[in-house]
Amino acid sequence: MHESFWQERWARDQIGFHLDQVNPYLLRHWPNLDVPAGARVLVPLCGKSLDLAWLAGQGHRVLGVELAEKAVQDFFAEQGLQPEIVQRGAFQVYRAGAVELWCGDFFALRPEDVADCLALYDRAALIALPPQMRERYAAHLTAILPGACRGLLITLDYLQSQMDGPPFAVSDGEVQAHFAAAWQLKTLQREDVLAGNWKFIRHELKALDEVVYRLNKRE
């Protein structure tokens, strides 16, 4: 999947993956992670998610990474914020208050960029990527984040043969294969969310589960 795919989706406002509210799983499960106030939180492939502002509102410093500049600009405009813009290595960094959005390729992130990230939040990153890129994404995430990092991972699980992604199906077995060697994993919630999801219903899916995992990186 090429960068141009996502650039075009944002240019055409084909962003059905964007939620117009804070993710309910974030609201329910984040407080139980006991992430310290002031901790920096990495949010890969963040789009213009309202979750970014919510995390900042909890007293966290937020580091979002997003390929599409339009998504980054839209976030600050919709939040009524005027960001400072600076260049940092391969990234154009937009900063306002407690939120920094790094516009560029996630795979260009280095360990020193995220050395103080004590937490991770992935709602729409892993499931946005095809299989070969998911393996690379998980490996890169593991390589750059510090030990004792904790966070939430939210996936979709359905029969991939019935529908092309994105969003892609990511099974529990795949999550275990990507993360179990370096992270402690705990399934916090599994919900059947097929009802009302017209995009999936029209593909005649029989089941569609959202799954929430807690991740704790081993030191």
UniProtKB/Swiss-Prot annotation:
InterPro entries assigned: SAM-dependent_MTases_sf, Thiopur_S-MeTfrase_Se/Te_detox, Thiopurine_S-MeTrfase, TPMT
Q: Tell me the first and last residues of the signal peptide.
A: none
Pfam families this protein is in? TPMT
Question: Any idea which UniProt keywords this protein has?
Answer: Cytoplasm, Methyltransferase, S-adenosyl-L-methionine, Transferase
Its annotated compartments are: Cytoplasm
Output the GO biological process annotations, alphabetical, semicolon-separated.
Answer: methylation; response to metal ion
EC code: 2.1.1.67
This protein's GO cellular component annotations are: cytoplasm
GO molecular function terms noted in the UniProt entry: thiopurine S-methyltransferase activity
Entry-linked SUPFAM superfamilies: S-adenosyl-L-methionine-dependent methyltransferases
Question: What cystine pairs are annotated?
Answer: none
- Reading the lineage from the top rank, the first entry is Bacteria
PROSITE patterns, alphabetized = SAM_MT_TPMT
Name of the protein this chain belongs to: Thiopurine S-methyltransferase
Instruction: Tell me what organism the protein belongs to.
Output: Ectopseudomonas mendocina (strain ymp)
What lineage does the source organism belong to? Bacteria, Pseudomonadati, Pseudomonadota, Gammaproteobacteria, Pseudomonadales
